[in-house]
């Protein structure tokens, strides 16, 4: 367990995690009283550029190590959201700041350092499998810290490039043998001894099949059934070495004893990846040393999102296979599609329902003809009809039910031209499901099951019976309408329309409503003429009078 590290005097603490370096970062308020003795402090990296470095006491980062709820949450996803952290604190009575600090310390121990884009993309990948723990093997690193100090001497502190903290490593007194991962100060007297109960709890967590983590017992049973050795399980598929691995290998080149009787600290293996892992791993001196190298690659192997059990490993592109071990890219393997186009397609993250919809094949002409022929007779199929249609067409029942629903919707809104052209005479345009009409589907479906599935179109209407009736009677009687409709294969309304078209056109009669006004207008000119004649006669009389006076 990383208890803390002692920064050399005179050096400025800086962060080199892909963010901007900060110069001379003072400790926070909690650490202000311990500035004279910085051995018990630990520097936690920020998550974004806006956050400052977090200095906290190393003892606070290990208070919650025995909380199974936090361990399970970290095993599911090492970057929980604020909502998840708040829910944990509310449900189990924890303090928000301590929980956030604990998660940052766990990520630092496991060497997980992702950018914000990688966090969001990886969260989107694992959101479809909420019932599985995708990172259940990461915390097995920290469980080695519960062993007594005499079993695990302090290994060398990594260089600044590996941990991401820009502080030079302290000088090493002598190379030591490493059985597990434990980073301690050089003087054991500075650190208080762990309680015995805490050590026993740690040891019980590390034993395979212990009751604290039941999912690990299933994992070891799967290892025994698959036939892989624990050493092969400790190195996982496509184990890669990061940029700063050379310094780790240089400091841990002392021969180490075989530790096959102990479980490996990390198990990066999936059930369907055993052939690839057996052929792609590189031989190592022991399972502990190989897992120690995996932890040394802080941003490579430990930061990879573990593939869930049952997954299929992606094939490595030739450009990545050609890279030497110390130049392999240091980002999670599942997120390399940004640099390798076409590596990870969007179809890998689709839900099973969406993938099933994409695999739906188009219906053939024969299948559509069978469905349309049945729909012309009955728009609401029964369970037996669906079974028959499923046998005849070969289509799955959900597709048949969906086709009937879509076709009924289109018919209700007047969008089915083929239904209007081929509708059965006398049948309603849209059948109400509440009206129980005996569908003629049982007999026809039984016949189609024995004969070829090609339907027979209905015969065209025949007008000759109507013409013979018109030539004989020249008039339509109401009692003869059903017989004529059956003989001509026309509906009752169509028969009536045909006879109406045969009737002679009635004579046009023009009715003028203004006749009285026209008569009055004709009388008025006659009166005017009579008045003019009377005036002329009066004028003649006046002339005669004048002549008489002369």
From Swiss-Prot:
Residues 55-114, 355-415, 451-510 bind DNA. InterPro entries: HD, Homeodomain-like_sf, Homez_homeobox_dom. CDD domains: homeodomain. Transmembrane segments: none annotated. Residues 1-10, 452-463 have a biased composition (Pro residues). A motif (Nuclear localization signal) lies at residues 358-363. Disulfide bonds: none annotated. Its main location: nucleus. The modification Phosphothreonine is found at residue 451. The modification Phosphoserine is found at residue 351. Keywords: DNA-binding, Homeobox, Isopeptide bond, Nucleus, Phosphoprotein, Repeat, Transcription, Transcription regulation, Ubl conjugation. This is Homeobox and leucine zipper protein Homez. Residues 1-36, 168-199, 223-265, 424-465, 512-550 are annotated as: Disordered. GO terms for molecular function: DNA binding; DNA-binding transcription factor activity, RNA polymerase II-specific. May function as a transcriptional regulator. The gene is HOMEZ. GO terms for biological process: regulation of transcription by RNA polymerase II. Pfam families: Homez. Residues 513-550 have a biased composition (Acidic residues). Ubiquitous. Strongly expressed in adult testis and kidney as well as fetal lung and kidney. One of its GO terms (cellular component) is nucleoplasm. It is found in: Nucleus. Homodimer or heterodimer (Potential). Interacts with HOXC8. There is a cross-link at residues 182, 200, 202 (Glycyl lysine isopeptide (Lys-Gly) (interchain with G-Cter in SUMO2)).
